[in-house]
Each structure stands twice: as structure tokens, then as C-alpha cells.
């Protein structure tokens, strides 16, 4: 008797959906591609699509959402007695360390062809804000202040902005790009 569960393995289905979407965005543009077309190309149901992605725009970000999730989990695990900023820097760098040079979201490198420029700006802002919220919660906890404290919010948004700048420069660096963590480290040095 086989112990294999029915259906595709979860990681394969997610990757298949991402690949199918990228192909369709390149062929038809982002705006002209429907979720039903993506599911059909990937060979999955519409329900399966929504098991992995809450919205079509989630397909644009590849590793970024997972990196924010890792950052949130790791920041919660930091000892409250540790100095906030060095711990924040180390945790951010650890969260992006496994993102290889081959994992650049196509939506960022192929914005014109895919027609994703407006959507990456819009959905990117959501990710920027989520990351800033995660960082603000950490800083507030470490410093014993309110999460809406001006200094906490200023630091959190400066750091989130630096990370966004690093992602942008990394994505646009082309075939000569270095690991993302190098760009993030340089951007964090600037703030």
C-alpha cells in the first residue's frame, strides 16, 4: 500500500503555479491574465490556487513574503534583554540569507514585458507596510515603548525602506548580481 497522499506535493504545486503565472504574464501581461488561466496552465483547481495565494498579486513577490514571515518569527524569538538594533540587523540578514541570486521575482526584472509596474508598486506598498509593522513591534518590545511611538515608527520605516531599496537594486543588477544579503547589509548601513 502506498503512503503517498493524493495530489501534487505542496511545494511542487506552489512552484508550478508560480511558473505558470510567470509564463502567462510574459505571454499576455499581468492585467490580461486571469486566475482561472493560471490554474489551468498549472494543472490545478481554482481552489488549489487559493490554498497557496490569497490574490493574484501574491504571485509577483516570490521569496519576499516568506522572508517577511521568517523575519517575524525570528524577531519574536529574540531575547528582550538583547540590544535592539544589532539584533534587528542580524535577524534581517538571516531572513534573506537563503534567497539565491536566481530567485529574483520576474515581476521586478520584467515589469515592462509583464505589465506589472503598477501592481508591483501597489502590492509592494502592502509588503513594505507589513515589514515595517513587524519591525516596529519588535523595536517597541525591545525598548519597552508603544508600537506607535514616533521614534519606533521612524526607525521601523527607515529600516523597511532600506530593505525595499536593497531588493530593488538587487533585482535590477542583472546577471552580475550578488547575494541579496549583501545589498541588504549595505542598505542597512545607510540607516
How should each PLM-predicted stretch be described?
Residues 17, 55-60, 70-71:
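Short amphipathic alpha-helical segment with a characteristic S/N-K-E followed by hydrophobic residues
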Residues 118-143, 150-157:
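Amphipathic alpha-helical packing segments from all-alpha helical-bundle domains
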Residues 99-102, 142, 166-174:
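Secondary-structure edge/capping motif, primarily at the C-terminal ends of alpha-helices
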Residues 4, 28-30, 50-62:
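HTH DNA-binding helix-turn interface
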Residues 106, 137, 148-170, 182-191:
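Hydrophobic alpha-helical segments that form the core
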Residues 47:
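Key DNA-contact positions within bacterial/archaeal DNA-binding proteins
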Residues 69-110:
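Hydrophobic alpha-helical connector segments
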Residues 1-28, 32-44:
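Basic, helix-initiating cap at the start of DNA-binding domains
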Amino acid at each position: 500500500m502506498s503512503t503517498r497522499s493524493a495530489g501534487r506535493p505542496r511545494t511542487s504545486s506552489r512552484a508550478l503555479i508560480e511558473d505558470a503565472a510567470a509564463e502567462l504574464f510574459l505571454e499576455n501581461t499581468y492585467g490580461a491574465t486571469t486566475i482561472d488561466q493560471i490554474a489551468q496552465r498549472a494543472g490545478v483547481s481554482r481552489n488549489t490556487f487559493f490554498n497557496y495565494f490569497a490574490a493574484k498579486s501574491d504571485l509577483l513577490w516570490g521569496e519576499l513574503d516568506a522572508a517577511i514571515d521568517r523575519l517575524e518569527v525570528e524577531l519574536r524569538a529574540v531575547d528582550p534583554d538583547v540590544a535592539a538594533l544589532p539584533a534587528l540587523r542580524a535577524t534581517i540578514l538571516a531572513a534573506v540569507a537563503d534567497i539565491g541570486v536566481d530567485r529574483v521575482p520576474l515581476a521586478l526584472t520584467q515589469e515592462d514585458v509583464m505589465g506589472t509596474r503598477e501592481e508591483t508598486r501597489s502590492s509592494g506598498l502592502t509588503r513594505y507596510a507589513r515589514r515595517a509593522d513587524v519591525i516596529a513591534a519588535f523595536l517597541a518590545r525591545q525598548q519597552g515603548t508603544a508600537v506607535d511611538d514616533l521614534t519606533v515608527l521612524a526607525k521601523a520605516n527607515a529600516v523597511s525602506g532600506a530593505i525595499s531599496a536593497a531588493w530593488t537594486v538587487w533585482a535590477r543588477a542583472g546577471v552580475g548580481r550578488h547575494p541579496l544579503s549583501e545589498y541588504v547589509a549595505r542598505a542597512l548601513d545607510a540607516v
